């Protein structure tokens, strides 16, 4: 059984406004992709498994449901918000953190994520072997 509903007018208006901003201010998109490339490079260089992500939304593969919850909580205590994705949303051995990059992020903020993950890796193994 499938249920479909049209988006609410305020959602449609928000989407249209976002598209208008993107069209009028291409520097925002450029900054988003610069930040995306920066974080992808840093995560890969540091040895974290991010799969084949090509978007500003990165999976950081943890592959253990319990570890995902622990790491997300540790990051939150450091002021870094991530989303844990675990079974049944993904296969049992594909548990991950989801990190979203924004155009408004500064490199220092992205570096703070890397530093926090490196600190956590000392206690909970999360880097690729």
Which residues does each PLM region occupy?
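PLP-dependent aminotransferase class I/II
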Residues: 1-43, 48-51
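A general structural signal for well-ordered alpha-helical segments in protein cores
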Residues: 12-15, 68, 110
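Beta-strand->loop->alpha-helix junctions that form or flank phosphate-binding loops
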Residues: 6, 83-88
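Conserved PLP-binding catalytic core of the aspartate aminotransferase-like
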Residues: 30-39, 44-79, 89, 93-94, ...
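Alpha-helix N-capping/helix-start residues
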Residues: 9, 26, 65, 107-108
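PLP-dependent enzyme catalytic core of the Aspartate aminotransferase-like
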Residues: 77-81, 89-129
